[in-house]
């Protein structure tokens, strides 16, 4: 597996869990901004050894790079309407953090572990889910939650 394939695997996982949300890669130039719900996948860093384990296969040296890739997942949501009081005023509740924590719970599930085994990867939480909601133009909120994950896999060269 290479970096591109690893990112595609993570993209597949996010579309599996966040059904109905647009999943996009972060740091894309000239990309059209999607309407919420949106999941943004960003690669933070890639670490691998300078001198990987190497073996001879059919007379040729083959190197295996154990690779750790840190990924950031940002979830943007519209929130959920909440009716309060008899006047039926509608408020909007921030659901981004709750949704991200549900994803973090999914990462610990038996289904998820089996999915990772099939893909020959390991995926672990690197941080707690964080509420990163922002006030925009003093008029509206952009509901957002962030989570960092560590994906481990082997590159063959």
What are these regions (language model features)?
Residues 1-61:
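Small/polar-rich, solvent-exposed N-terminal microdomains that initiate assembly or binding
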Residues 32, 62-64, 138-140:
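Sterically constrained small-residue positions within well-ordered secondary structures
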Residues 49-51, 83, 157:
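Short acidic, gly/pro-rich beta-turn/loop elements at beta-sheet edges
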Residues 63-87, 103, 142-153:
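Oligomerization/assembly interface segments of phage tail-like spikes and tubes
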Residues 88, 92-93:
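Short, structured beta-strand-loop surface elements
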Residues 94-98:
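Winged helix-turn-helix DNA-binding recognition segment
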Residues 99-107:
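Short amphipathic alpha-helices in soluble, non-transmembrane regions
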Residues 107-157:
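Acidic-leaning, charged glycine-interspersed low-complexity segments
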């Amino acid at each position: 597996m290479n970096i591109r394939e690893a990112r595609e695997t993570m993209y597949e996982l996010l579309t599996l869990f966040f059904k109905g949300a647009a999943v996009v890669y972060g740091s894309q130039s000239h990309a059209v901004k999607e309407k919420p719900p949106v999941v943004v996948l960003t690669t933070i860093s890639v670490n691998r050894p300078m001198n990987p384990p190497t073996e001879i296969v059919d007379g040729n040296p083959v190197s295996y790079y154990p690779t750790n890739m840190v990924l950031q997942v940002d979830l943007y949501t519209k929130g959920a309407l909440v009716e309060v009081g008899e006047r039926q005023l509608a408020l909007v509740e921030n659901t981004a953090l709750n949704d991200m924590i549900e994803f973090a719970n999914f990462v610990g599930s038996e289904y998820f572990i089996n999915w990772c085994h099939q893909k020959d990867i390991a995926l672990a939480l690197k941080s707690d889910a964080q509420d990163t909601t922002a006030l925009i133009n003093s008029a509206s909120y952009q509901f957002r939650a962030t989570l960092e994950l560590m994906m481990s896999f082997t590159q063959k060269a």
